Amino acid sequence: MIEAPPFDKSLGMLYYVTDTCPAGGVIKARPEDFIVEEVLKDGTVVALTGISLKPRVGSWTWIHVVKKNTDTLKLLLYLAKTLGLKARDISIGGIKDTRAVTSQIISIRGDVTNLPKIRNVEFLSFWPMDKPITPSLIYGNRFTITLRNVEKVDCAEATLKTLQYIALPNYYGYQRFGTIRPVSHLLGKALVKKDAEEFFDIMFCKIFAYESDVAKKAREAACKGDYRRALEIFPKRFIEERAVLRGLLRGLDLWNAIMSIPIQILRIYVEALQSYLFNLFLSKRMELGPLNRPIEGDLVEINGQVVHYAEGLGGEVVLPTVGVGVKMPRGKVGEAVLQLLKREGVEPSMFLKMPRGLRVYGGYRKVVLTLRDFRYAVDKEVTVSFTLPRGSYATVILREVVKPEEPYRHGF
């Protein structure tokens, strides 16, 4: 176990579990280098080449969607707007990577016949179904990833060999927070604290080196109070920023202007805060001992039930995702969790005091990443394939290989 660089630490990922040398390389030199195929609960892979499902009579349509370089959430918002549907009439089993080629099922209420043509999006097959696709119907995702421009192939091979037997920390990965603008969790903290000014400052006054010149100019204008000019500069893809600016120009107060951001996006911010806190908890737990060996005070999951560990009990170690209704660890682990919450100025009750649609309850997440069907090949490029359960991040594995100082420069 070695210390991670400052960028990772800012997201709560304080350590690498491997002590091998950095391989370098780029993970998304082209979208085809990062392939994600959804895996249903019964093991069916929603393959890029096609899938056969048994239709059921009902009020939903399941659609096999293959997309490239396309944001999942923005695709759903566009479909809802184009088809005249409400957000609850479209559902997915999980959000997929944007800079990638991804294959998944989406479901739309009703009989869908005329879907719009969308660049880089293919609708391959349609099935009538009696219920929507939801996260509970998804096992996870199968990944096939090519790492190019590897600087030290021997370092990559050493890390990949180590990953076959080591207990990997189940961190929330970079894309949960952003790599160009790693602020999703900070916006989430401002939301749960109901601090509109802090939210505004993070969204518009915090500017990062790898942002486009257009985005930088727009943020500078907004930060100086020139909302109309900022709105003119921001391209349409900046949905959140434009929503806040339009609200302010309509005369809304700052909080209500922020609340005009689509609820799905606001919820992502709140969940990013939960993810950041979990990463901090997990990093602290790594300091206290091996993740695959429960210690006094740990929470463990046994047959779907979460209990406090007792000697001889067994079970897999879990940590809480902060919110209402979850048990907290005891002993040294519990003390560390409480100290971290105090340092971050967050209380579990804050998550329940949010406006309707943003209230999130707590839960539990395994501390060890479950890695299945792991294979790799090392040549000029490095190719890796594996299957992960829903909610786990491929970039957590790849960061161990690349060990990037600046993740964005390496395609993360």
From Swiss-Prot:
Gene Ontology terms, MF aspect: RNA binding; tRNA pseudouridine(13) synthase activity
SUPFAM superfamilies: Pseudouridine synthase
TM stretches of this protein: none
The reaction(s) this protein catalyses: uridine(13) in tRNA = pseudouridine(13) in tRNA
Domain called TRUD: residue spans: 167-370
InterPro entries in the cross-refs: PsdUridine_synth_cat_dom_sf (IPR020103), PsdUridine_synth_TruD (IPR001656), PsdUridine_synth_TruD_CS (IPR020119), PsdUridine_synth_TruD_insert (IPR011760), TruD_catalytic (IPR042214)
Record: active site: D97
Broad class of enzyme this protein falls into: isomerase
The enzyme's E.C. designation: 5.4.99.27
BP term (GO), one: tRNA pseudouridine synthesis
Keyword annotations of the record: Isomerase, tRNA processing
NCBIfam families (alphabetical): tRNA_TruD_broad (TIGR00094)
Function: Could be responsible for synthesis of pseudouridine from uracil-13 in transfer RNAs.
HAMAP family, per database record: TruD
The family this protein is said to belong to: Belongs to the pseudouridine synthase TruD family.
PANTHER family (alphabetical): PSEUDOURIDYLATE SYNTHASE PUS7L, TRNA PSEUDOURIDINE SYNTHASE D
Protein name, UniProt field: Probable tRNA pseudouridine synthase D
Organism name: Pyrobaculum islandicum (strain DSM 4184 / JCM 9189 / GEO3)
Gene: truD
